């Protein structure tokens, strides 16, 4: 995740306006919960238990598929809508998504 100090400063000094619905907050909260739940399962894994190992590998594979689907959805629907509203507004996020896709591919290669 990249933090832009100028954006943080602008937010801190922004005038109060009517709150906007944040389309990102709930899905990303759910994604973090899914990732943490999967991490806990992997962390508690007995690697000598072949059935448990297979189940954990399946959980990780399903998580990676969900994350990839989420990225594709944002790239296909959310980013174009952002760009229609404000040109260039999705560029930083699109770059993050490239990094996320590489990480998903790398993790998927070892599961």
Describe each PLM feature range.
Residues 1-111:
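Small-residue-biased structural context
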